């Protein structure tokens, strides 16, 4: 691997155990991280605004809940586990004014720091600890004595505590050292994460799935078959990719499917490469971040319109029917 990788044997858990951790936010990531840290004998408190619906949940799970200002004043390490677009508003009002030299502020994604939404005072550390998976998987893997890969990065050093040692120790407390903790930068994590979401995992995959479905429908094929071939079976392929890689996927499909994939890749590849380069450039030059923050300032008009329209599409209507047996089993 090109990136440095650290495992449990390389990391001192005592570093984070000696510090008071405060987590701002108690969504999927906040809850999972808090529970994992506590099970790793780390002192954890939760910071929430007054009236938050998460207060009762956090208290029910045995955590002390403070206001954000109070949490900052009583913590050595403060983790900002809030949506990216809220970092600037919350941190500028309730975190930064109350920070002292030597404290460390942590993030699970590099967006707000990399795009200068958040600038921390000199002497305050800025670290990234990013589990490579959702909160549910982070908790489930920890309880199975396994873990998720974690990324760490250091943007700014603390005048008191070694930021790298703290980031590594925090990742170990969440189970990251069981799988591997990779050291990167805020820039690399942020830009690659956004690109993966837009070009492949969310934007790219959704576009291919929907276009494939519509192509079959317009050609007169039944909606059920179009859904099975273009949506339902994505999980089968994704699981093979996840566990066995591209070569392993090839070994588990028919010769017909493999030859067809190679033939289809040739015309699609050139077009996709050019489009992906444009997507990456807009991420790198800050255009996407600017557009997203403008969308937030206008109260998400495009997101709301798209979400409403999606419910009315054929792919969702037939999908809801075909997914019903699976959801019923859960």
UniProtKB/Swiss-Prot annotation:
BP term (GO), one: isoleucine biosynthetic process
UniProt keyword terms in alphabetical order: Amino-acid biosynthesis, Branched-chain amino acid biosynthesis, Magnesium, Metal-binding, NADP, Oxidoreductase
GO CC annotations, alphabetized: cytosol
Cofactor(s) the record lists: Mg(2+)
Residue sites binding Mg(2+) 2 per the record: 193, 229, 233
Gene3D superfamilies, A to Z: 6.10.240.10, NAD(P)-binding Rossmann-like Domain
Record's cofactor remark: Binds 2 magnesium ions per subunit.
Source organism superkingdom: Bacteria
Pathway: Amino-acid biosynthesis; L-isoleucine biosynthesis; L-isoleucine from 2-oxobutanoate: step 2/4; Amino-acid biosynthesis; L-valine biosynthesis; L-valine from pyruvate: step 2/4
UniProt-annotated binding residues for NADP(+): 26-29, 52, 54, 135
Domain KARI C-terminal knotted per the UniProt entry, residue ranges: 185-329
GO terms assigned for molecular function: ketol-acid reductoisomerase activity; magnesium ion binding; NADP binding
Domain KARI N-terminal Rossmann per the UniProt entry, residue ranges: 3-184
Primary enzyme class: oxidoreductase
Record-listed substrate binding positions: 254
Keyword NADP belongs to the record: yes
Disulfide bond residue pairs: none
Residues the record marks as active site: 109
Record-listed Mg(2+) 1 binding positions: 193, 197
EC number: 1.1.1.86
PROSITE patterns xref list: KARI_C, KARI_N
Catalytic activity: (2R)-2,3-dihydroxy-3-methylbutanoate + NADP(+) = (2S)-2-acetolactate + NADPH + H(+); (2R,3R)-2,3-dihydroxy-3-methylpentanoate + NADP(+) = (S)-2-ethyl-2-hydroxy-3-oxobutanoate + NADPH + H(+)
Family statement drawn from the similarity comment of this UniProt entry: Belongs to the ketol-acid reductoisomerase family.
Protein name as annotated: Ketol-acid reductoisomerase (NADP(+))
């Amino acid at each position: 691997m090109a990136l440095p990788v650290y495992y449990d044997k390389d990391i001192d858990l005592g570093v984070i155990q000696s510090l008071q951790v405060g987590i701002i936010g108690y969504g999927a990531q906040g809850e999972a991280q808090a529970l994992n840290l506590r099970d790793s004998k780390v002192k954890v408190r939760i910071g929430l605004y007054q009236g938050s619906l998460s207060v009762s949940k956090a208290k029910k799970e045995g955590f002390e809940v403070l206001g954000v200002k109070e949490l900052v004043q009583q913590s050595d390490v403060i983790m900002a586990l809030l949506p990216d677009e809220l970092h600037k508003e919350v941190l500028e009002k309730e975190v930064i004014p109350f920070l002292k030299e030597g404290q460390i502020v942590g993030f699970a994604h590099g967006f707000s720091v990399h795009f200068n939404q958040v600038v921390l005072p000199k002497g305050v550390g800025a670290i990234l600890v990013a589990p490579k998976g959702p909160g549910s998987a982070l908790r489930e893997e920890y309880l199975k004595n396994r873990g998720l890969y974690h990324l760490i990065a250091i943007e700014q050093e603390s005048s008191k505590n070694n930021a790298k040692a703290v980031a590594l120790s925090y990742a170990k407390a969440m189970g990251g050292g069981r799988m591997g903790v990779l050291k990167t930068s805020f820039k690399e994590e942020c830009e690659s994460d956004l690109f993966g979401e837009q070009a492949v995992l969310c934007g790219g995959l959704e576009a291919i799935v929907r276009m494939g479905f519509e192509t079959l429908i317009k050609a007169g094929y039944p909606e059920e078959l179009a859904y099975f071939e273009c949506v339902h079976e994505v999980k089968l392929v994704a699981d093979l990719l996840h566990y066995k890689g591209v070569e392993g996927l090839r070994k588990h499909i028919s010769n017909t499917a493999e030859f067809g994939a190679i033939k289809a890749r040739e015309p699609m590849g050139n077009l996709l490469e050019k489009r992906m380069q444009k997507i990456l450039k807009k991420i790198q030059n800050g255009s996407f971040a600017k557009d997203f923050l403008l969308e937030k300032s206008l109260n998400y008009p495009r997101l709301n319109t798209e979400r409403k329209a999606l419910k009315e599409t054929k792919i969702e209507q037939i999908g809801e029917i075909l997914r019903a047996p699976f959801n019923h089993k859960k």
